[in-house]
Structures are given as structure tokens and as C-alpha cells.
Amino acid sequence: MPSVSKAAAAALSGSPPQTEKPTHYRYLKEFRTEQCPLFSQHKCAQHRPFTCFHWHFLNQRRRRPLRRRDGTFNYSPDVYCSKYNEATGVCPDGDECPYLHRTTGDTERKYHLRYYKTGTCIHETDARGHCVKNGLHCAFAHGPLDLRPPVCDVRELQAQEALQNGQLGGGEGVPDLQPGVLASQAMIEKILSEDPRWQDANFVLGSYKTEQCPKPPRLCRQGYACPHYHNSRDRRRNPRRFQYRSTPCPSVKHGDEWGEPSRCDGGDGCQYCHSRTEQQFHPESTKCNDMRQTGYCPRGPFCAFAHVEKSLGMVNEWGCHDLHLTSPSSTGSGQPGNAKRRDSPAEGGPRGSEQDSKQNHLAVFAAVHPPAPSVSSSVASSLASSAGSGSSSPTALPAPPARALPLGPASSTVEAVLGSALDLHLSNVNIASLEKDLEEQDGHDLGAAGPRSLAGSAPVAIPGSLPRAPSLHSPSSASTSPLGSLSQPLPGPVGSSAMTPPQQPPPLRSEPGTLGSAASSYSPLGLNGVPGSIWDFVSGSFSPSPSPILSAGPPSSSSASPNGAELARVRRQLDEAKRKIRQWEESWQQVKQVCDAWQREAQEAKERARVADSDRQLALQKKEEVEAQVIFQLRAKQCVACRERAHGAVLRPCQHHILCEPCAATAPECPYCKGQPLQW
């Protein structure tokens, strides 16, 4: 890395600092470093929301970053101070503290010489050129002209050069780290050597920030890179034991500030996030944002996000990994490997050798975490795989985990499936493709192939598996229908359906043991604990094609009657489900219209209030001017001596008109000319 060596040499030689643009220099030097003069007078209009250029409270105050002559910073841009009080904004060491203070908005780190405007913002700009997310004071660059090179610490450059030479355990294959991002590398290497469990990605996903740091706060200098939590606001509940969504808890987070998790009455059993750490490192998150933007993560191997594409599959399998491990019959059929490949089709064949190792790692999760598969995460995985979208999108919203619902009777199975899908997000369900599937199914049922399709539709009984419902299948492709992703080929040695006599399927039961074993034997994409392959028909050739059952055998009169009634019943259920979907969509549209109307009314009310306030200020100003004029006129017409009667007498020889007649008769001389010589 020649650039690092040159930069280190330049830093050691004391080369002049780089020239900054005027706007960048102003923010680096003055942003939140001085107290707002208007706030002390209660006149600052940028307090709520807080968008002022200056600080209002001490915990918003930012120290000015400086690079000394020896090439070091006055405070570290990476290692946080453990003695800084985030509530009061006071540090015992004062401004001389060599560590980073976690101010409001993390301004000391974002607006440091090393990080300010060194990365591109992922959000767009509005009509005024301001960031739509961070506003006017966005610390990231919007466009190539807004980028600035980072200012590097000389010790960091030396450590980076040592890492390149292999002195810190990097050796060959070390990525080209950008300047100013190598923080606590020696500590990370030391912890990895002391505790090799942190090298396991699954252990990091489940244990990051879940245990308190064993070191005293003053001895732990990792800060941002420490895999343990130091206070309750930094704590992350173990996702193996607690299931919670990525949505912040309304009792803990008010506005943009996170409060104490003890404010929530639900405690650790709450289904919402209690800290910024729980929200940022949620198991359903995707790729690490630092890796995506800069190609380097300061947390290193302790990061709970995915650093490479191939590890994203484990994140997607978080909510359904126990389905692969709870059934002993899944080891012989080879189905778990196929199911994993269906979960992440974009990873290709090279992942085949890694599935066994990941299976062993996930076995630890299954021993601690009982089989309670997440409904909505399974639906999200199936919908994502059916739409052909990869899992590397950093903006994909993680599906909130829900409780596993018990399997109901056969008459409500379709409603439960569609209800769970609607709980996830209504826009994920392709209504048009569902209607097309129903129309094509009606055409197949009423056409000439209808009686023939019932010849080989008798279900095949598989020992130790859940009985199959012989009646729900979409003739369209699995990638176009929202229910098509639930269809999976049935594994195991099964004979031809033509050799099996017709029989009426037994009713479905919701036994936990049977449900868990059956779900683990088929596919991790089942809804409410039901495997996706339970909706398949068994064709004569046992093909994984999602087309409806069309057997070439002769029509059977014995199986036509019961299956025809069953098909009619399921068709009625689908019509009812489609009607409910339309009702949901209409209700959602109505709510959206009402919300839009409320937003418009709120904006109009704010505009009217602003106009009324400006009119009020203008009216008060005019009133004061009129009152001043009236007072002046009244005083101009009164006698200056008695202040009661109007002046009417003209004094001589000065010709002043300031006294009334009685006062002019008694006054020996003009009050205005008193003490002044008369000009003749």
C-alpha cells in the first residue's frame, strides 16, 4: 500500500495540512462548538426539532478536532470515553480528555477530521439541496464535489502499515483498508486469540453485546469495537432466548433519543427493541453498512452484520433454523440441503460444501432455542426467493418476528395462510397473479381435462409425516404467485400415485410433536409451522414442476365424486380468501387516504398558524406605531406648563406657541427660551 507509506512519511515529516473547502472548514471548526446566543434568550426557533448550528445543552457540545504537530489528534475519533456522562455532558477530564465523547447525535465522531464528508450519503436531496434524512447538517457527502479526503493520525498510519506487513496477524490477503478506519486492531486480535468463539459467525450473531464487559469501564478502551455492553443502553437481549421486533419500544424511545430500558413495563419480554444496539444488530438485518459504504468495519469480527455475501444466508435462516434440526428423518432424505439452497438461490453451487458446517453451528442454536419458527420471517424469505431478489439490499426492511400459531382445521388453513401473509405486508402479495391463478384453475376444472385430472390425485401416505391436504395448488409458476413459493416437491421414496388406491385423507391435527417433525422434514418456508410441501399434489412422475395434477391414466369414477366435492369446497375457500384480501386492500386504501388527508390538513394548519402569527406580529407593530403617534400629537397640543389645557397664546418676542392663555399671562418669560439669549 504505497499511499499509506507516503501518507505516514508526510505526517512524520510535518507536512502542511490539507486545504479545506470554506463550507467544510466552517463545519469542522464551528459546528456545535459554541453555545447558541438566542437559546439563552428563549428565542431560538431551531430547538424542536433540534437543527441549530450551535449547541443548546452541554450534552450537545462538540469539541473542535485538532491535529497536532506530531501528527496525532487531540482526541481519538474511534475509542469512546467511559467516564463521559451522556445525560449531563460532563467529563471529569474536561476538554483535555483524549477519548471520544458520545454527544447527542454522535457529532464528535461524525464531524471529526477523519470522518466528516469522507463517505457518500445513501439518501437523496430535496429541492433546496438538503439531505432528506439528515437535513442541512448532513455529515456525509452528496456528490463527488462534496467529498473530502480524511485526515489521518500518524499512529494509525503506522499501525496500518504494520498490519500490511503482517505484524498484527494480518499477513497476506489483508483488505485495502481506507485511511482512518483502523481502530483497536491489536485488541481485536488479542480477544480473538483468547476466545476463539468470536471467530464463529453464528456465535457473534447470537452473543454480540449480550453480556456485560468483564473489564472495568476505565480499563476497556475498545468502545465501539467492544463485543460486550458497558451500560443498560448498550445492552442487547439474546435473540436466542427473546424474540423481539426491530421496531423501537415507544416506552423507551421518545423522538430521536433512546431512554433507559427500565422504563418499559414489559422488561426483557417486550416484543420491541429497547436500545439502539438491539435495533442496529437485529438478527434479520442484512449486510453491514460500514462494509457496504467503506469496505471496512471498525467492529471487525465482532460485528453482528454480514460482511460477505455468503453469510447472508445464515441471517435469512435465523428464524427457521430449528426446522432443519428437530426431525431425525431429515438426515436421510437430503431435503434440508435442498431447502437451504432454495432459501438463497443466488449463492450458487459453491455453498454446497459449507452447508454441513453451518448445520453443525446451527445445532447449538436448536439445543438452546426450542422449535418455534417465526411466521413472518418465513413468509418474508419465501416472498423474497419467489421474487428473485437477493438478500444484499441494505434498505430491505426486516420482517418482525411473530409467535408461532397453531395449525387449525382444514377449512381455515387457507385463511390462516393468507392472514399471515397480510400480517407481513399487503404489498408483498401479488393480487393480480392470485386472481389469474384462480381463473386458470377454474378453466382447468371446467374443461375437458377436469375428470382426467382426478384420476391420480389420491394422496400418498408417508409414514411419520403429516397428512396431506389434497386440494390446494396453483397452476402458475412459483415465482409469479404469492402462494407458489409455498409449493415444494415432496421428498422421500414415494411410489406412483396410480398404484395407490383412492382414499379419503384424514383430518389435519395440530399436535406439536407431529407438526415439528413434519415441518423439519420438508421445508423451512412453512407458515404457522406447516411445511410448504403440504400444499403439493403428487404427480405420477414425481416431478418438482408446479403445474397441476394432470395424469395420463384413464378416468376413475370412484375417485371423481369425493375429490370433486373437495375441490369445490376448496374453491369456495379460495373465493372467500380472495374476498377477504380485497376487503383488506380496500381498508388499507381507505386508511391511507385518511392518513394523507390528515397530513395535508396538518400542513395546511401549520401554514395557517404561521401566516396568522406573522399577521399578529405585523398588527402589533402597527399598533405600537399608531400609539406613539397619538401620544406625540397629544403632547404637542398641550400646554408645557400646566399639561391640562391646549396651548393658544403666542409669546413675544420669540413667537413660540407653547403656553395657554392663563399660563402666558402669569409666566414672566418663555419656558422654551429660558436661559437662552434672545436673538433680535
UniProtKB/Swiss-Prot annotation:
Reported modifications of this chain: Isoform 4 is ubiquitinated in the C-terminal. Ubiquitination is enhanced by activated RAC1. The presence of the RING finger domain is not essential for ubiquitination to occur.
EC identifiers of the protein: 2.3.2.-
Keywords: Coiled coil, Cytoplasm, Metal-binding, Nucleus, Repeat, Transferase, Ubl conjugation, Ubl conjugation pathway, Zinc, Zinc-finger
GO terms assigned for molecular function: transferase activity; zinc ion binding
Region listing for Disordered, in residue ranges: 1-22, 326-358, 375-400, 442-520, 545-566
RING-type zinc finger span: 639-674
Family: Belongs to the unkempt family.
Function: May participate in a protein complex showing an E3 ligase activity regulated by RAC1. Ubiquitination is directed towards itself and possibly other substrates, such as SMARCD2/BAF60b. Intrinsic E3 ligase activity has not been proven.
Protein name: Putative E3 ubiquitin-protein ligase UNKL
